[in-house]
Amino acid sequence: MGPQQDRSAAKPYANGSTAAAAAAGRKENNKVVRYRECQRNHAASIGGHAVDGCREFMASGADGTAAALLCAACGCHQSFHRREVEAAAAECDCSSDTSSGTGRR
């Protein structure tokens, strides 16, 4: 057996970032990611096309566990579900006063 590794240390990704940095980046973007209908082709092995009809991904376990990546409804991995990214509503002052009278007619 080899030497014991410290599993509490941050594990870097291939690009050099850590899991904590990646999670912080997701929060900074203010985007909401939802996984919609399952697109897994259950009849691919026989040359057909059949989907199971699952309409939205529901995690079967708590966040951070392996079960969180499996859908409770259809049993498929999260990657089979269509990914939908929604940008959070930007805060803006929508009260514009355009009645300055300098526009063309």
Swiss-Prot record:
It holds the Pfam family ZF-HD_dimer. Residues 1-29 are annotated as: Disordered. InterPro entries: ZF_HD_homeobox_Cys/His_dimer. The keyword Zinc applies. It is found in: Cytoplasm. The keyword Lyase does not apply. Inhibits zinc finger homeodomain (ZHD) transcription factors, by interacting with them to prevent both their nuclear localization and their DNA-binding properties. This is Mini zinc finger protein 2. It comes from Oryza sativa subsp. indica.
